[in-house]
Every structure is written in C-alpha cells, then in structure tokens.
C-alpha cells in the first residue's frame, strides 16, 4: 500500500477539528471577477518658484476618477565647484614633478611585483611535485642565483623609497614588508613544528601544504592590495599632468549631498481638500517610514530612487552629476488602493499638494575654505538651483456603472493620518515630555538628536537627518531609559530598556528593524495593516507623555559641540474622511 494512502486512512477524532465539515480545498482555485478599470500615471506641474527653500503648490487636475499613488520627481543640478585658478594648489611644474616621482616609483613596484610573482609561480610548481623533498627545494630557492633578481628589485625599490629627493608622504608609506616570497619560504622552512612525529618526510609534507596555502590564499591578495593603491595613485598623477598639458586642468572645492537626499530635501508636504489640511508629512517622517516599512530586498532600489548613493554622498572634489530623485508619497490613499481618493466625488472642492523644500545648506555641505564666504554666496556664484520638479499621479479610470456610483453616492473612509510634535533646546540629563495628540492611535515613534545634526549655518558641516544614534555610522543609543506615561501612570514598564523599543517592538510589529535611536511602540496588534486591531484613543487622555533619560554618549556630543537636544515624536492615528454633495471633510478635528 502506498504511504500516502496510509496517511489518508489514519483518521481520528482529533482530525475532526481540522478537516471535519471542510470549507475550502487546496486543489481547486477560485477567483472573483472585478470591476473594469485602468490606471495611468500622469504628470502634474507646480505653481511657484521650484528651488531650495521655496514652497510650491500643485492643484490636482481631475483627469481621472480616483487618485492613488503619488510620486515627487526632483531634478537636482550638476555640481562643479571650480576654484579660481589663483587659488589652485598645483601648477604645471609641480604636477610634472609629482608625476615623474610616482612614475619612477610605479615602475620599480611593477618590476618587484612581477619578479615576486614569477618566483612564487616557480616555488608553487616545486612544492606541488611530490618527487622533490622540501630540503631539496630549499637548496634551490635559497640559492643566491635563484633569488638574486628579487633581491635587486627589492633593493632598488627600498632605496628609492628612502631617497629624500624622490619621496613624498604616499611613497614613503609604501615599503613592502609582508609578501617577499623568499622570506615567506624561509620562515616556514625554518619553523619548528611541535608535533609528535619526527619523520622528515611528514614534516616536509606539512610545511609544503602550509606554503601552498599561503601562496594561494594570502600572497597574491597581499600583492594585489599593495599594487592597486599605487596604480591608482599613478593614474591620478598621470591624469593631472596630462590635463595641464592639454589645458583642461582645474581644481574643485570638496562637496557632497546629505544621505537620503530625497527625504532630507523635503521640509514638509501636506494635502488639502477644500482648503482643509487632511494630512501633513515631514522629511523626518519619510525617513522614519522608510526605516520601519521598507522591505530589505527593496532597500537598494529605493536608495537609488531617493539619491542615497555614493556618487552623491561621498565628500570629495569630483564633479557631482545631475540626478533625478523619485520620492513616493505615503499618504493613506498611496498605500492602499481600496482607499483611493474619489476625485469624481469632489465637484466643488479642489485637492492640493503643498510642498516646502529645505534650504540648500541643509541638504549639502562644502569644504571648510576661507574662499567660501557662505552657502548663499556659493549658490549664487555657481548657480546651484533645482532644474525641475513635478508630481506623477496614478489616476484610476472606472467603467460607467462604477463611475456613476462613485459620483452620486456619499462616501465615508477610515483613513490613517500622521500627527507630530517637536521640542528643541533641551539641555537636561532627563526630560519629561507632555504631548498633545488626538484620535485613536495605532503606534508612536520617537527619537532624539543633537541639534547640530539638523543645522548647517556656515554650509561647511553635514546635516545628519537620518542619524538617530551617537556615532557617524548611525550606531549608539542616545537614551539610557525611556517609557510612556498616561495620566501620571506608567503605560510601559520603566525597566524594559531602550532595546525593547528599538529592536523588540519593530521585530514583532513592523517590517524592518530601524537603526539605533529610533524608538517605536505599537498599541495595535497589526500596525502595518489598515484594518484596526486595537488603538489608544488619545482624545480621551489628559496627560500623555514620554520620559527620556539621555545617555552619557549623547551628553558628551552635546557638551563638545555646545549644542542642545532635539526631540521629535510621531503618531499614526485614525480619522474619518467623508465625501458628500461634491465636498469632503474630516469627521474629527485635532485638539
């Protein structure tokens, strides 16, 4: 009897709870027929001056029946901060001298690496031959005639490095110490092995295997690592000299855009219906949402969309090419097609997006140079202005019957809206916040940052909008302790520790775990879903707050930079959006 038939036959009382009176089958796919529709992304243009620090407005054209996903596209300019030739560090004679030195050095390095590689290949061949003992191989390898060429190549290289007339800082640091194949062979050959056998053949075999392993796994990599840095330096000096020769040489100021530029460039964006603000998101919220909701396999692609790429964020004097930022909005109707905004039901009300962009100094930084007076001066001198910006809206087109139903019926949507509060100039070791929020709330997110992470008055320091930690690599906890408080009662246990809010809560309730310093607490069982699964009604709470105890690491940063602490907190809450008689409005107002 087949095993599967046996499994089918052994049916007991317990199985009744699983398969008694079955309601589904896994072997017959069913589906539901849907209404006829189409989706098209259509561009919308802005009213106002599209530039850093400006507010721009887009009134949504009612080209479709519903509005779903919305994307902001911003074209940032090419950055080429060429110094005045009178301020150049190099001239043609200096460039030629540098090129001559590195060229001679590179030739000696190339020769040394070539000879060393050739000898390593020969030694590897000898070691792989089982008919030659290690002692016989040593007689060949350690003979002067075998290694004289390598000795000469190393001597020439070492002499050049130590020659005071031909060295510079880079060359002087490039003495090769670890990958001379003769020295490696000699050290292994003469090494005492603390093993039980005294058989010279066995000892020789062990040492042969060790030498082959060193050659195959370590030697070639060490030679490559040594060579490649020198080769790059050689190419760099060569290109500089040749640019002097053909008249194309120029020196640039160092420059970089901040990380997560697509988020950082937004001060805020709000959506109004009939001149009533329905929801408002800040650049901080875009960063927070990304860290909690972006799937790990989407991060690389998403970073390209928002300009979080090395060619923009590395601080150097290379030209930064123009780049197209694509920033998806995260309003309720963007994340759920079942909540698509029914434009066809808004006969008398307009839908409008207002976007405030940050100033240039808050999204980039330049080298600390006395020739640079200010970021405003730099922006004017080099014409650093946005090229263009536009919205792309996914319009949904309905078939006749459904279109008529949307147009003539009243609608009531349960929507998710963001509320936030910020506090600045905090200079205590502990802080008890008092927050004013409204409506049934799914979850709360909070963070603290040194205020100077968010400021760049001179244009020469980097704003770290996405850094909620205490180190430049986004690590380190800025809080020692934190907990929630409701009407003077502790809503969460003070002894849970910051890791509970930074790691445990995101692990259980969200899609991604954020970087250090971003804390979250969910009042809902499934906060990532639109379906309510428990909330805290903050409209009924008289005193809601968060207790903060700052870490020593954060205090040191504040003290050393003469700064203060910025505290931000965001909640996701529910509200009702009603459509009736060609107009729309919120069911409940914020307190």
Swiss-Prot record:
GO molecular function: structural molecule activity
Gene Ontology CC: viral capsid
Pfam families: Capsid_N (PF16903), Capsid_NCLDV (PF04451)
InterPro entries (UniProt xref): Capsid_N, MCP_C, MCP_C_sf, VP_dsDNA_II
Source domain of life: Viruses
Subcellular compartments: Virion
Main location (coarse class): virion
Alphabetical keyword list: Capsid protein, Virion
Entry-linked Gene3D superfamilies: Adenovirus Type 2 Hexon, domain 4, Major capsid protein Vp54
Protein family (similarity comment): Belongs to the NCLDV major capsid protein family.
UniProt-recorded name of the protein: Probable capsid protein 2
Record organism: Acanthamoeba polyphaga mimivirus (APMV)
């Amino acid at each position: 009897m087949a095993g599967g038939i046996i499994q089918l036959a052994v049916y007991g009382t317990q199985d009744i709870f699983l398969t008694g009176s079955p309601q589904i089958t896994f072997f017959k796919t069913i589906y539901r027929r849907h209404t006829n529709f189409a989706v098209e992304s259509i561009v919308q243009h802005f009213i106002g001056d599209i530039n850093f620090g400006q507010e721009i407005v887009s009134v949504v054209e009612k080209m479709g029946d519903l509005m779903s996903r919305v994307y902001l596209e911003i074209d940032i300019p090419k950055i080429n901060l060429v110094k005045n030739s009178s301020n150049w560090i190099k001239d043609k004679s200096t460039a030629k001298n540098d090129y001559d030195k590195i060229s001679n050095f590179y030739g000696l390095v190339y020769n040394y690496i070539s000879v060393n590689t050739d000898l390593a290949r020969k030694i590897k061949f000898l070691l792989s031959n089982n008919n030659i003992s290690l002692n016989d191989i040593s007689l060949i390898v350690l003979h002067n005639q075998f290694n004289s060429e390598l000795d000469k190549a190393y001597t020439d290289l070492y002499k050049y490095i130590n020659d005071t007339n031909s060295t510079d800082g880079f060359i002087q640091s490039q003495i090769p110490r670890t990958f001379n194949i003769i020295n490696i062979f000699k050290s292994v050959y003469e090494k005492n092995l603390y093993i039980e056998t005294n058989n010279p053949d066995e000892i020789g075999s062990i040492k042969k295997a060790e030498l082959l392993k060193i050659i195959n796994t370590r030697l070639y990599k060490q030679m490559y690592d040594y060579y490649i840095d020198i080769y790059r330096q050689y190419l760099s000096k060569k290109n500089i000299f040749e640019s002097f020769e053909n008249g194309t040489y120029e020196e640039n100021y160092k420059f970089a855009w901040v990380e997560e530029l697509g988020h950082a460039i937004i001060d805020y964006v709000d959506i109004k219906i009939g001149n009533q603000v329905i929801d408002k998101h800040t650049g901080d919220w875009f960063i927070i949402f990304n860290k909690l909701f972006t799937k790990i396999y989407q991060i690389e692609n998403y970073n390209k969309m928002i300009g979080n790429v090395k060619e923009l964020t590395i601080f150097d004097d290379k030209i930064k090419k123009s780049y197209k930022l694509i920033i998806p909005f995260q309003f309720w109707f963007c994340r759920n097609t079942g909540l698509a905004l029914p434009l066809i039901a808004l006969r008398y009300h307009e839908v409008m997006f207002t976007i405030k962009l940050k100033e240039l100094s808050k999204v980039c930084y330049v080298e600390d140079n006395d020739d640079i007076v200010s970021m405003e001066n730099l922006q004017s001198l080099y014409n650093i202005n946005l090229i263009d910006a536009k919205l792309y809206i996914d319009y949904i087109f309905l078939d006749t019957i459904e279109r008529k139903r949307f147009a003539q019926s009243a609608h009531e949507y349960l929507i998710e809206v963001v509320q936030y509060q910020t506090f600045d100039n905090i200079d205590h070791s502990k802080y008890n916040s008092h927050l004013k929020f409204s409506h049934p709330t799914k979850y709360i997110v909070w963070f603290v940052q040194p205020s100077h992470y968010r400021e760049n008055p001179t244009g020469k320091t980097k704003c770290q909008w996405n850094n909620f930690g205490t180190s430049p690599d986004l690590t380190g906890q800025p809080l020692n302790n934190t907990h929630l408080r409701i009407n003077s009662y502790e809503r969460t246990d003070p002894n849970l520790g910051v890791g509970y809010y930074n790691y445990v809560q995101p692990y259980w309730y969200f899609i991604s775990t954020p970087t250090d310093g971003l804390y979250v607490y969910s009042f809902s069982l499934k906060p990532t879903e639109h379906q309510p699964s428990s909330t805290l009604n903050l409209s009924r709470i008289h005193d809601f707050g968060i207790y903060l105890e700052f870490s020593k690491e954060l205090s040191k940063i504040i003290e050393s930079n003469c700064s203060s602490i910025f505290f931000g907190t965001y909640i996701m809450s529910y509200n009702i959006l009603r459509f009736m008689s060609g107009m729309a409005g919120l069911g409940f107002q914020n307190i």
